[in-house]
Amino acid sequence: MLLLQALLFLLILPSHAEDDVTTTEELAPALVPPPKGTCAGWMAGIPGHPGHNGTPGRDGRDGTPGEKGEKGDAGLLGPKGETGDVGMTGAEGPRGFPGTPGRKGEPGEAAYVYRSAFSVGLETRVTVPNVPIRFTKIFYNQQNHYDGSTGKFYCNIPGLYYFSYHITVYMKDVKVSLFKKDKAVLFTYDQYQEKNVDQASGSVLLHLEVGDQVWLQVYGDGDHNGLYADNVNDSTFTGFLLYHDTN
């Protein structure tokens, strides 16, 4: 082995003779010193090929946050979106403050008041049974809806009417009935007490149509005709409209 190494050394020297002269001391470091021990005959091999790239290493740790940048410019206005669905009705809000009073309105038309009334009395005690009693003593008959010549009230305004009568009874019993359109609707009977003046009365509500007639008359024979009146005792018949029909 030593012989082979010396031979290689001699072969190397001529290749460098034409160049600069190199001493043995300068070349000595380039030679690998022979190993010692059991492998004293080892010789350096030819350098191998470069190895493959290793696997990528792990990602490094996150760096510290940078400083906040400056605010950017506002972007352009985007297109108008589609109309959304109608939302649910919200809760009722609190009651507002009262508003200021409005202006006074123009005067309205006066409502028309329907009037129909009469109040009459008996001037004589002479009456005929079974015919209308003619009350000729007029207390009130401004609308002239009562006719003293016939003793009848004639309806000119349809509606609800109130009728009443107060009869003085003397010398005989009395039977009086109130008629509407030839039909008795109310009856009053009073039995005379000797040496006394009695009173008989009655009242009723009736609905009348235009043209209806209402009156009083004594019914029965002459024995039941104690109807009486003088200058201190009256027998009266009264009626008036309460409500007129609106349709």
UniProtKB/Swiss-Prot annotation:
Residues with the 4-hydroxyproline modification: 47, 50, 56, 94
Regulation: Polymerization and secretion of adiponectin is inhibited by succination of cysteine residues by the Krebs cycle intermediate fumarate, which leads to S-(2-succinyl)cysteine residues.
GO CC, one annotated term: collagen trimer
Alphabetically ordered keywords of this record: Collagen, Disulfide bond, Glycoprotein, Hormone, Hydroxylation, Repeat, Secreted, Signal
Protein's cellular compartments: Secreted
Cross-referenced PANTHER family: ADIPONECTIN, EMILIN ELASTIN MICROFIBRIL INTERFACE-LOCATED PROTEIN ELASTIN MICROFIBRIL INTERFACER
The protein's name in its UniProt record: Adiponectin
Organism classification: Eukaryota, Metazoa, Chordata, Craniata, Vertebrata
